[in-house]
């Protein structure tokens, strides 16, 4: 049977096919950061479980850390001034030490954004399964990997078992034919695609990008496209590996060498779709139709060419769509039918896991060389990793940016999501190379326009959104694959180990388990059979996770206490904290709501933060009814004993109308019926998920019953794909030898 790329990679990782179509799959690579991991490690500790495969796990700090100079860095406690941010970062370090994992901390010469360091180290490889508690894990699909974001419960599941329970997604192909026009980058392609299919267009799918425009891209450009696939609603995005991929990986620190490398490449060359493979959805786009693109609203699907205008409200027939556009324009502060070129900006941000690599910085530097940013603009460049930063500095890019008036920063997520000191002030408008333009994403009241690095650089010089094709471009020498080996002088704080080196003691140093607590342990959930109570009606489309729980509330190491943060920017004034009595959850009846009825589609789009269902649970809402859900949020609900129900629009509107009267609604999971005074409505739910909810079952405990099958798969994996095992792996958990912070005078030998 002909297979797609996704089919091939998925099938090579199936350990056990279970009833109801669920599969237990093996995870090859796990990336960990400070925001979505504390509760997972605490769950392991409470259950007395070790990390199964430390050799397949790599951790770093990126979201919370300041990107200010680190010349005087001593330790996290003194460097990070925000207490909750410092706590998360210190907690990660403690967990790394306790469980014996490889860690690129702030004192390490290889620290950076998780989705930058994985590829540049060769940790990401073709044909692998890659996960991280971060939605933009889709980035790694550029290598032909099946890479997707997961919530904290699944982070714990992977740490404990190196597996996940998954149901096969649909196959979607996006084919971009022809060569891109001058000034058009992979970021423009990605934004254009999202504009065509919408932020829910890829829901339930794994997207395979192909066609001349995609296949001719460099690896770093491919990463940008796959990074943005989550913004199209997809579970993952993939591009088949080829000679461009192999050249990029050759000699990377963690890539195989010699005969093992040849064997790996031979396998990787089989990872492409068969000629007669069938796709559930195919979208064809002409590259010639794509221009330099910019967002105008508060969703990545709100896009237009730089030569275009904001939507004309009078021409939108659908009243719900017109209302959504009006809300977006009101927030972004631009009138209907306004030309995008010439919109004045206040800040420029070049960085994020989407666009912070050397190929992103080079074209931006070429735009600004010999020029100055507009007087009223604050501009910053944040390299994606310490290695990218040093590579750029060797090329003199830092000097070019600084002479043009840009602030040259240290590596980190920075202004992408405003969990650190790099934030927009209320009303400030930013030309940003990041991936989301949600309300308040870069700072409360901040306004974000997504675009390419070259377009962002041009906006900084002109002081407004501008067409990069009208800018003079300086010549800067940038060759293709320059990053496999980085000769970096180690600092006194550099704890650079021989990565994945095994020691005599192969047992992770797990701290003694503590008694399990309801707030931390994942050793079971409250059973969900029936739920009766008030149902709060909500008529908003594309409710994103930033709206559900803003980024400032993610700085916690517990699962509880987040109910007060639920829909914070809608329930309260973000600046004063005053209540908004007009919001539904502030109405007396719905303060006690146990069910939410949303009549707008694509509920829960955005990040993988499991803090969103935690906030609902803490508030008291355990069931959400909506026309459709974003994949990761949908999955996270079940992991937390919540029931997301998909119903047709007409039925939802009828239930919402009854709920508005203040009557109670009952959800009967056993019978799969929603009851309200207006009648009964049946709903569908996957049998396995229903079984787990009704019985309050723990996924990890269920998976542990498959220990023999997991071990058998690992034996096969070592024999068939030996390059996937960490160095020193001999069938046991491999403890990593950390240098311990001793000063190393010699250059690092990668």
Curated annotation (Swiss-Prot):
The keyword Metal-binding applies. Gene3D superfamilies: Aconitase, domain 3, Aconitase, domain 4. It is an enzyme of class 4 (lyase). CDD domains: IPMI, IPMI_Swivel. NCBIfam families: leuC, leuD, PRK01641.1, PRK05478.1, PRK12466.1. Belongs to the aconitase/IPM isomerase family. Catalyzes the isomerization between 2-isopropylmalate and 3-isopropylmalate, via the formation of 2-isopropylmaleate. This is 3-isopropylmalate dehydratase. It comes from Rhizopus niveus.
